[in-house]
Each structure stands twice: as C-alpha cells, then as structure tokens.
C-alpha cells in the first residue's frame, strides 16, 4: 500500500478513489540531492518557527 493524494480536493488517502469521487495519484517524495537547492530556505523556515 502506498499513500495517495487526490488532485481535486488535496486529501491524502490509501484508497484508489477519493471520497469526493476523483481518482487518486501516487505521492512521490522529492529526489535526494547532496547539493540541496532549497536546504538553506528550509533551515531558515525551521529557525523562524522555533523562535
């Protein structure tokens, strides 16, 4: 079983059909990269949330 997301209502589910009746799509995590382009911004956001 894989987690799926409804493109219509943006809900996550394990079913192939969402409660709204739309067919769900498989959610894929972002590809790993040693040179993370957005790591700087993610760390800045994390710091601002902690403060």
From Swiss-Prot:
One Pfam family here: Nop10p
KW Ubl conjugation (keyword) present: no
Single GO BP term: rRNA processing
Gene3D superfamilies: H/ACA ribonucleoprotein complex, subunit Nop10
GO cellular component: ribonucleoprotein complex
Keywords: Ribonucleoprotein, Ribosome biogenesis, rRNA processing
Keyword Metal-binding attributed: no
SUPFAM superfamilies membership: Nop10-like SnoRNP (SSF144210)
Molecular function via GO: snoRNA binding
Classification via InterPro entries: H/ACA_rnp_Nop10, H/ACA_rnp_Nop10_sf, Nop10_arc-typ
Domain of life assignment: Archaea
Role of this protein: Involved in ribosome biogenesis; more specifically in 18S rRNA pseudouridylation and in cleavage of pre-rRNA.
Recorded family membership: Belongs to the NOP10 family.
Protein name listed in UniProt: Ribosome biogenesis protein Nop10
Provenance organism: Methanococcus aeolicus (strain ATCC BAA-1280 / DSM 17508 / OCM 812 / Nankai-3)
């Amino acid at each position: 079983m894989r987690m799926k997301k409804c493109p219509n209502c943006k809900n996550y589910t394990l079913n192939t059909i969402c409660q709204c009746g739309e067919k769900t799509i498989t959610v894929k995590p972002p590809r790993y990269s040693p040179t993370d382009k957005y790591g700087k911004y993610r760390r800045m956001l994390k710091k601002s949330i902690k403060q």
